[in-house]
Amino acid sequence: REIQPRALLLENVRGLSMPRFAGYRQHVLDRLNEFGYSAEWQQIEARQFGVPQLRPRFVLIAMQHRYFHSFNWPKPQGEAPTVGETLRDIMKRKKVFDDDDALNAWVKLANRPAPTIVGGSKKHGGADLGPTRAKLAWKDMGVDGHGLHDDDKPYSRNDRSITALGPKLTPEMVARLQGWDDAEFSWDFEGRKTAKYRQIGNAFPPPVAKALGLAIFNALNAANAPAAMPENSAIKSAVDPIYRVLRDSGEYMTVADIANKSEAYVNELEVARRINLLSRDFDIEEKERDGLISYRLGGFRAFTGQQDHSRHEIFEKNRSRIS
């Protein structure tokens, strides 16, 4: 609102695309529209842009109204190489395997994309390759996912850089799996291996960033920039119809009233279910009259960085299943 950039890109985990967050997503679009931006959400698969990793991300692109009409999401560029193909040259250079036959056997075993590189943070997670299910996937590819090996140290079974599960990866290898290479994309990561791993795992894959960046660049530099768009045409993403009815009304409404006002066909049971979902991100005010409960949409109370938010407790209870 203060800086008024011409374009904005935000990315989050795939979970934000679930129906449970429809009201949350629309609230974000509504606020951006108030500030003069058209916006759209879309799920992007990193492996469709050359990143050898299962890394679905939910991306928001917002642009000032006059530019957004020229924006087109980038088209997938084909499937990425496998983990084995991606890391073959580094494994050979570091002499991880005794000979080429052993290396080739490992490349054949690691014949799929990597699980999501999660990186961790000071509060959540350390220098390993993710939760339990990710470690099992690494095990199936002949990689020990229970830690990392230092870039500047040789491999040896004596220091457990190679175990019965296979070799541990180095930050350089993880960076390659995240999309950095020695040609088009390169970066010097600072700190020790855990710090490097966090920088790598929490970054947006460079090939995906490039594809989205070029799409934004092309829209901003379109030869014939369109005139300002009407405000109501700025929002293209699907919304929760119950959220929309409550938002537009601003008044108390019964479940039957909400169902009747909704453009999409929803029965009263579905209305009640969606109100329950909305209550996780918004204050839903209730009022009883003549034996009927009426509802009104209140303030937004979803996570916006609060240290005391309930999401932290939920994260701790479920961290082994989060990637």
Predicted regions and their residues:
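Class I S-adenosyl-L-methionine
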Residues: 1-140
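C-terminal target-recognition/interaction regions appended to catalytic cores
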Residues: 98-323
